Amino acid sequence: VHGHLRDPYHRVDVRRSSAHVVVRRGDEVLAESRRPMIVSETGLPNRWYLPMADVSAPLASSTTTTHCPYKGDSTYYGLPDQPDVAWGYHEPYDDTTRIAGHVCFLADGITTDVDGRPA
């Protein structure tokens, strides 16, 4: 088994948003978007996925990958001095195709604000 098995009671919803999302590391803005996707998944906090076109940081693909039975295989991205700060799905499964071309940030020292408030 690659990853974990699907739970028939698990739910993943992807919604478009017009919220103003800013991702920072300290004072450095890594990404800023007014067209994010919000992913709500059973048992997890909401995650904000931003279009790659709205990322200003110099992200590079890493060798880290993971598998989600609900979204598919992910690719991780790092900064020159910090690995694996974001991930995305190049070919997400049918129920989550809207997150293709988007990345989600989550790492030590990375903050995400939504409409001026911590996410």
Predicted features by range, described:
Residues 1-119:
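Terminal leader/tail segments of proteins
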